[in-house]
Each structure stands twice: as structure tokens, then as C-alpha cells.
């Protein structure tokens, strides 16, 4: 196999691969023999079909199979031989069965341009102070009370107010036609939550059971449902019932209602404080990492190809749609993949890629690698996530994308810990945090 590289730019290389004639001949002959045994052509016994006949029927198919097989088998080897590390999937083109009998193809490989990175020791960071105030615990308790509130139908005929739950039927109309997919019966609208539309709930305040009201609201162009995106929607709403929320008392019975493992209110409060503390610690780590990354990005200039950034934008849009789908929402892909939205995503997409490249560079320069124990932990985490046994993950998915991504994430965490240990630290006060 002959391999050569042509420099197109610092971030793009043309990889040229040629398979020798003898190897090509062997592969094609094998395909013809296999095809001869498999096919049935009238007038010929199985295995006795002349090659010229097979070629007239299946010649192009055989060439395509051989071409795909050679690319699949030789491309990773060619990358290794030339030490090219593609940032995204390469574009393979110019495949040829040459007159000499050889087979050749070309691949455009997008790579990270060479860059130097120094001065990452001694970065200045300010660590947020970590503390959980009583007010935070009280706020979480109030949220739990809201979750466990009892809904009672109003005994008096007072009008609905914010915080009440209105049981309603509603029918939306778009351009004079009923939007059937948007209709709902016995919908429980908590007034003030603005779950249907930011302007929807205000039209329920002051209404009584039995009343019907009509009003219009405007949906933005990027509304999740394409039928109403950028449209003015007329809602006809019938209030069937108004319920008020009755919050439970803060006592030991409430704690047990939240979770039977709590035998007293103080135990619930302590658990809430511990969970809030974990949240504060996570946020503090994220804040420090953000400070580190901002300084690292200011130290280098890396020109990425447009294709690399585009693929990261694709990934970000895909993740967003996946989040919606996981919540049971079927979204119109075109609404989230417009040129305007993609342009908005590009700065963050570029930042994501640079983050990975810079951290990878530091890990390489500082020889930061995963220990055997940390690799074992990766297998265990993937096995838990995929609901497989660890042995299966090790033997069948050791080189899978999910395992590699998990390893990469752990190395990045190791790099951040190293940089933090080498940094010059100050502290952010609670007053500064609250500003």
C-alpha cells in the first residue's frame, strides 16, 4: 500500500492511498468466485456462470463492494502510518480502479493545526465560597410543600387568582381553523406557571367556574410546534373548576410524606442541606473550570476548518432535539436547524472543540493518563448506564464511542485538577456571589 499526504492548509490534508494490483486482483477474483456460487442465472448451473456473464450483471456491484472494503480496511492504517488525527469523519472521494490494476482513493482529512501552549501553570483563579444558608433550605422546603399540596375545589364562588389551579377545556385556532393537535380537555393549569404560553395564564385570573373566555396570543418563529410557529393563535377556554392549593404543615408527618426514610423534619432538613451543598460544590467546580478555560483560550489561536465547526453544530442541534424527544415532544428539525440558529451556535461550537484540543495538549505534555483503576471505573460506569455486565463492555465495547468519550471526560477532569493545583487561588465572597 502506497500512502502520501498533500498539505492543503494547516488544518486540512489530502490523504492519497493506492492498493497494489496483486492485492486488488485477489480481492476481485474472490468476489467473482463468491458471486458465482451465490447467483442463479437461467441456462447456467450454480458455480458455472462464466465471468463475462457475471460481470455484465454484477460488475459494478462487485467494484463497489471491493472499493468499500478496501477503504474500510486501509483508511485506519493509512491514518496511523501518516500520523494524521482527523477531528471529524473524513470525506473520501476520487476512487479509481486504475489501468495498471491498482485501486486508489483520496480522503480530505480535517486536523488540528500545530500550536504551542505555554503558561498554563500559575493561572489566577478565584474559588467561590461554599456555604448553604438557612434561606436556601427554607426555599427547598417550600418547593416540596408545593409538590405535596392538596388541591381543594373552592367552596365559595371567588374568582381564580395566581397560585390556583384551573381545570379547563381549551381549543386553539390558527388562521381561522381549529388546531386539533393543540386541543385539551380537563387540563389542569396552575395559574402563574405559564406552561401553555407566557400570556395564557393572565387571561384566567378573575375567571369563575362555568365561564368561557376567548383571547389571542402570538407564538415566536422558533416555537416547538411548526403549525403555530410565528402565528397568532386564538384560544377559546372554558373554566370548568377552580381549585386552591393547600400546603401541608412543616412537621414530622410532612417529612415522612416526602420520603418514608425520614422519621423527623430535622432529618429532611439535614438531607436538603447536604444535597444543596453538593450542588454548590459542583457549581463552584464548574465556575473554576470556566475561569481556567477562559485563560487558556486567550493563550492560543487555533484556526479550525469550517467543516469541523459545522459537525459540532450538528451535534449540538442533535442533542437539543434528543432532549425534547426524551420529554415526549416531537419537534420539527427544520425549525432548529436554520442558518440563523446555526450561526448563533457556531461560537459555542468552536469553543467546545478548542476546549477539547487544549486539554488534550496539556494531558499529553504533562503525561496525564488514566490509571488501571480509573479505566476499570469507566467500564463499570458504562456497564451501569447500558445495563450490561462489565465483562461484556470490556470484550465487546472497549473501543466504542461511549467508552472513549467517558475516558476522555475523565482525563479532562484530571487536567483541570492539575491546573487548579498549579494555580494561584483567591476566594469569592458570598456577597460577590449574590451580586
Swiss-Prot record:
It is found in: Cytoplasm. Involved in protein export. Acts as a chaperone by maintaining the newly synthesized protein in an open conformation. Functions as a peptidyl-prolyl cis-trans isomerase. PANTHER family: TRIGGER FACTOR CHAPERONE AND PEPTIDYL-PROLYL CIS/TRANS ISOMERASE, TRIGGER FACTOR-LIKE PROTEIN TIG, CHLOROPLASTIC. GO terms for cellular component: cytoplasm. Consists of 3 domains; the N-terminus binds the ribosome, the middle domain has PPIase activity, while the C-terminus has intrinsic chaperone activity on its own. GO terms for biological process: 'de novo' cotranslational protein folding; cell division; chaperone-mediated protein folding; protein transport; protein unfolding. Its EC number is 5.2.1.8. It catalyses: [protein]-peptidylproline (omega=180) = [protein]-peptidylproline (omega=0). It comes from Syntrophobacter fumaroxidans (strain DSM 10017 / MPOB). One of its GO terms (molecular function) is ribosome binding. Belongs to the FKBP-type PPIase family. Tig subfamily. This is Trigger factor.
Amino acid at each position: 500500500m502506497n500512502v502520501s499526504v498533500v498539505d492543503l492548509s494547516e488544518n486540512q490534508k489530502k490523504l492519497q492511498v493506492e492498493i497494489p494490483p496483486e492485492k486488488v486482483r485477489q480481492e476481485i477474483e474472490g468476489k467473482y468466485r463468491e458471486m458465482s456460487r451465490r447467483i442463479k442465472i437461467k441456462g447456467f448451473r450454480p458455480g458455472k456462470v462464466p465471468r463475462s456473464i457475471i460481470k455484465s450483471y454484477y460488475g459494478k456491484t462487485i467494484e463497489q463492494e471491493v472499493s468499500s472494503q478496501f477503504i474500510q480496511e486501509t483508511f485506519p492504517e493509512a491514518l496511523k502510518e501518516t500520523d494524521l488525527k482527523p477531528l471529524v469523519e473524513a470525506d473520501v472521494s476520487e476512487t479509481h480502479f486504475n489501468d495498471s490494476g491498482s485501486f486508489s482513493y483520496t480522503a480530505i482529512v480535517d486536523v488540528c493545526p500545530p500550536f504551542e501552549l505555554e503558561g498554563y501553570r500559575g493561572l489566577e483563579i478565584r474559588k467561590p465560597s461554599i456555604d448553604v444558608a438557612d434561606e436556601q433550605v427554607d426555599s427547598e422546603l417550600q418547593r416540596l410543600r408545593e409538590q405535596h399540596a392538596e388541591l381543594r375545589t373552592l367552596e365559595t364562588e371567588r374568582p381564580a387568582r395566581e397560585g390556583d389551579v384551573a381545570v379547563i377545556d381549551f381549543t386553539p385556532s390558527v388562521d381561522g381553523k381549529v388546531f386539533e393537535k393543540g386541543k385539551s380537555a380537563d387540563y389542569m393549569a396552575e395559574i402563574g406557571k405559564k406552561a401553555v404560553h407566557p400570556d395564557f395564564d393572565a387571561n384566567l385570573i378573575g375567571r369563575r367556574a362555568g365561564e368561557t373566555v376567548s383571547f389571542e396570543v402570538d407564538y415566536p418563529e422558533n416555537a416547538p410546534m411548526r403549525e403555530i410557529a410565528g402565528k397568532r393563535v386564538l384560544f377559546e377556554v372554558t373554566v370548568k373548576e377552580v381549585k386552591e392549593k393547600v400546603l401541608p404543615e412543616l412537621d414530622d408527618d410532612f417529612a415522612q410524606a416526602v420520603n418514608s426514610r425520614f422519621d423527623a423534619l430535622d432529618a429532611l432538613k439535614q438531607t436538603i442541606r447536604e444535597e444543596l451543598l453538593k450542588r454548590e460544590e459542583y457549581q463552584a467546580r464548574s465556575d473554576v473550570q470556566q475561569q481556567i478555560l477562559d485563560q487558556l483560550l486567550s493563550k492560543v489561536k487555533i484556526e479550525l476548518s469550517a467543516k469541523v465547526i459545522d459537525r459540532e453544530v450538528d451535534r449540538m442541534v442533535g442533542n437539543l432535539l434528543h432532549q425534547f424527544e426524551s420529554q415526549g415532544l416531537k419537534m420539527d428539525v427544520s425549525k432548529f436547524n436554520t442558518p440563523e440558529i446555526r450561526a448563533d451556535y457556531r461560537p459555542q461550537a468552536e469553543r467546545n472543540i478548542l476546549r477539547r484540543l487544549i486539554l488534550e495538549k496539556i494531558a499529553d505534555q504533562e503525561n496525564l493518563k488514566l490509571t488501571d483503576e480509573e479505566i476499570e471505573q469507566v467500564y463499570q460506569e458504562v456497564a451501569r448506564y447500558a445495563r450490561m455486565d462489565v465483562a461484556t463492555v470490556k470484550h465487546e465495547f472497549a473501543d466504542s464511542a461511549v467508552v472513549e468519550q467517558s475516558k476522555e471526560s475523565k482525563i479532562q477532569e484530571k487536567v483541570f485538577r492539575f491546573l487548579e493545583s498549579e494555580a494561584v487561588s483567591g476566594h469569592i465572597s458570598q456577597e460577590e456571589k449574590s451580586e
